[in-house]
Amino acid sequence: VEWTDAERSAILSLWGKIDTDELGPALLARLXLVXXXTQRYF
């Protein structure tokens, strides 16, 4: 994928706003709950 400078800037800006310490465990828990039902699609 070739990202433009504007796209890179937007992505970095969004990632800067995410609190990974707070959201990380919640996202992993959701992944563990959904993975069994969607495993065959990946």
Curated annotation (Swiss-Prot):
Keywords, A to Z? Heme, Iron, Metal-binding, Oxygen transport, Transport
InterPro entries linked to this entry: Globin, Globin-like_sf, Globin/Proto
Q: In which tissues is it expressed?
A: Red blood cells.
GO molecular-function annotation terms?
heme binding; metal ion binding; oxygen binding; oxygen carrier activity
SUPFAM superfamilies, alphabetized: Globin-like
KW Heme (keyword) present: yes
- Top-level division of the source organism's lineage: Eukaryota
> What family, per the record?
Belongs to the globin family.
Q: What is this protein called?
A: Hemoglobin subunit beta-A
Lineage runs: Eukaryota, Metazoa, Chordata, Craniata, Vertebrata
